[in-house]
């Protein structure tokens, strides 16, 4: 293409003047964990916010399963072991390139539920045009075979063992979600690298009470003295192990929630909401990952260093920081992920922002897993009663993909995890950015603008069409290292 080189190059510019603004992202210090106090373990504190119909989240409890559990710290640690190493827990099965301590993303799950995607305190930003409720989820029931039940991946058939002293014919339970959809099947069992049914069911109950109900409606669930959550935690305590008590509390939860759904309470509350708490977004995405990618994560190890086929993930907190706080995306906008892997970021943008979300990937195994995730994503959103943005997943080379090129013309935010891209591919991307509309943001791990003038004409084009800002991400934001690093937000001039 003579446009970018040779005598006919029409881009004649002065040496690029690059504005670099370093933005330090402060990571909230973790609060020290209080010493266990059985009398207070179920207590709840209420938020003073008034825009949501939901109470402030309860303090998180550790799993009381008598066996080692896939605790939050391991579930949220995205610096995953390579497939050749034994896996920690379902949601922990991410590709890892070094060994670091657990729990680096723990603060991600302890964010205040009532905080407007963190923007309430920082910027007051809310997207009033987002319609969060899925009408279909409250009008029709999907076939229970449309989604992957927990029992399909963690059961007696999968060599798991019963917990709480249950006999084999006592392990089956079902869990109601905040919609008309079928209840999910679980078994009260434990197995290495398997879904912990005790922990998972308590978390679902807690998320429903915190997000979908007003304080008054949530009282039967959150009351520290005999509320359903308190009873579930007490019954599953390793020193008590009350199987019948646990199942009775879960049955009561199912009945009360279904009554609230049938009475239109859940739908009414969702209609007043315009966003989901970040920790619920992460929980739903992890449910999807656990039932799809985690089962076949070894397929992602087939990459080659020094090529454009290296696999790595940007984690939930990173994406929330960029899409919610920095670029302030809204549900009416368009997001494009170039090199979308298994689709994690595409799905997060659609769920957390509600925007039209595009992704393109050329690695076959990653594409196949992305399709599996999308199918489960659609079903899980129905279970939770929420309507995400439209998701489009494309296969192949994004440089040659016509739908992606059309989407780029409308894009408001483009993400390129180009940390391991070859220089040729990065150069080709700059050419593609000529079609971006003015004001479009390009988020990347490497800058597309050279720091110093050189003879590489493509960098002259980058400085001509992009204004770049350098930012710093803290530790625990990417899958391939625990260390922090730089990323760039470029704006199309």
From Swiss-Prot:
Disulfide feature: none
Biased composition, class Low complexity, residue ranges: 38-52
UniProt superkingdom: Eukaryota
InterPro entries attached to this UniProt entry: Dot1 (IPR021162), DOT1_dom (IPR025789), H3-K79_meTrfase (IPR030445), SAM-dependent_MTases_sf (IPR029063)
EC number: 2.1.1.360
Gene3D superfamilies (UniProt xref): 1.10.260.170, Vaccinia Virus protein VP39
Localization terms from the record: Nucleus
GO MF term (any one): histone H3K79 trimethyltransferase activity
Regulation acting on activity, per entry: Ubiquitination of histone H2B to form H2BK123ub1 is required for efficient DOT1 methyltransferase activity on histone H3.
Domain named DOT1: residues: 182-493
Residue positions binding S-adenosyl-L-methionine: 311-314, 335-344, 361, 397-398
Catalytic activity: L-lysyl(79)-[histone H3] + 3 S-adenosyl-L-methionine = N(6),N(6),N(6)-trimethyl-L-lysyl(79)-[histone H3] + 3 S-adenosyl-L-homocysteine + 3 H(+)
Keywords: Chromatin regulator, Methyltransferase, Nucleus, Repeat, S-adenosyl-L-methionine, Transcription, Transcription regulation, Transferase
Regions of compositional bias (Basic and acidic residues) in chain numbering: 11-29, 90-100, 112-121
UniProt GO cellular component terms: chromosome, telomeric region; nucleosome; nucleus
GO BP terms, alphabetized: DNA damage checkpoint signaling; DNA repair; methylation; subtelomeric heterochromatin formation
Spans annotated as Disordered: 1-127
Entry's family note: Belongs to the class I-like SAM-binding methyltransferase superfamily. DOT1 family.
Note: In contrast to other lysine histone methyltransferases, it does not contain a SET domain, suggesting the existence of another mechanism for methylation of lysine residues of histones.
Summary of the function given for this chain in its UniProt record: Histone methyltransferase that specifically trimethylates histone H3 to form H3K79me3. This methylation is required for telomere silencing and for the pachytene checkpoint during the meiotic cell cycle by allowing the recruitment of RAD9 to double strand breaks. Nucleosomes are preferred as substrate compared to free histone.
Name under which the protein is recorded: Histone-lysine N-methyltransferase, H3 lysine-79 specific
Organism: Gibberella zeae (strain ATCC MYA-4620 / CBS 123657 / FGSC 9075 / NRRL 31084 / PH-1)
Lineage: Eukaryota, Fungi, Dikarya, Ascomycota, Pezizomycotina
């Amino acid at each position: 293409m003579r446009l970018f080189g040779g005598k006919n190059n029409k881009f004649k510019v002065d040496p690029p003047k690059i504005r670099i603004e370093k933005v330090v992202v402060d990571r909230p210090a973790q609060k020290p964990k209080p010493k266990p106090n059985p009398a207070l373990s179920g207590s709840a504190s209420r938020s003073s916010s008034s825009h949501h119909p939901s109470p402030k989240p309860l303090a998180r409890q550790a799993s009381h399963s008598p066996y080692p559990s896939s605790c939050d710290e391991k579930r949220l640690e995205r610096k995953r072991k390579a497939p050749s190493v034994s896996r920690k827990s379902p949601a922990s099965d991410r590709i890892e390139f070094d060994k670091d301590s657990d729990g680096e993303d723990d603060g991600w799950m302890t964010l205040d539920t009532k905080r407007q995607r963190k923007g309430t305190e920082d910027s007051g930003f809310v997207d009033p045009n987002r319609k969060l409720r899925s009408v279909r989820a409250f009008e029709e029931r999907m076939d229970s075979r449309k989604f992957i039940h927990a029992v399909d991946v963690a059961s007696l058939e999968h060599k798991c063992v019963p917990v709480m002293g249950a006999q084999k014919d006592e392990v089956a339970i079902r869990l109601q979600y905040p919609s008309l959809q079928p209840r999910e099947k679980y078994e009260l069992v434990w197995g290495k690298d398997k879904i912990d049914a005790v922990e998972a069911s308590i978390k679902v109950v807690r998320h429903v009470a915190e997000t979908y109900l007003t304080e008054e409606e949530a009282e039967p669930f959150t009351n520290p003295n005999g509320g359903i959550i308190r009873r579930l935690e007490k019954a599953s305590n390793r020193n008590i192990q009350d199987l019948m008590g646990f199942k009775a509390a879960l049955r009561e939860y199912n009945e009360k929630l279904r009554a609230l759904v049938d009475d239109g309470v859940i739908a009414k509350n969702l209609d007043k909401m315009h966003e989901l708490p970040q920790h619920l977004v992460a929980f739903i995405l992890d449910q999807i990952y656990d039932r799809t990618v985690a089962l076949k994560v070894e397929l992602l190890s087939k990459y080659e260093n020094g090529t454009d086929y290296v696999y790595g993930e940007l984690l939930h907190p990173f994406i929330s920081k960029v899409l919610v706080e920095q670029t302030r995306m809204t549900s009416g906008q368009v997001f494009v992920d170039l090199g979308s892997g298994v689709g994690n970021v595409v799905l997060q943008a659609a769920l957390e922002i509600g925007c039209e979300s595009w992704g393109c990937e050329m690695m076959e195994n990653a594409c196949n897993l992305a399709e599996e995730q999308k199918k489960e994503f659609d079903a899980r959103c129905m279970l939770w009663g929420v309507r995400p943005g439209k998701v489009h997943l494309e296969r192949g080379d994004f440089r040659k993909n016509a739908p992606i090129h059309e989407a780029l013309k409308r894009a408001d935010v483009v993400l390129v995890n180009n940390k391991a891209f070859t220089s040729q591919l990065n150069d080709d991307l700059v050419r593609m950015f000529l079609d971006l509309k003015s004001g479009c943001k390009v988020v990347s791990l490497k800058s597309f603008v050279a720091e110093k003038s050189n003879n590489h004409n493509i960098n002259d084009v980058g400085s001509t069409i992009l204004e770049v800002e350098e930012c710093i991400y803290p530790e625990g934001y990417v899958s391939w290292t625990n260390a922090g690093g730089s990323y760039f937000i470029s704006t199309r001039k």
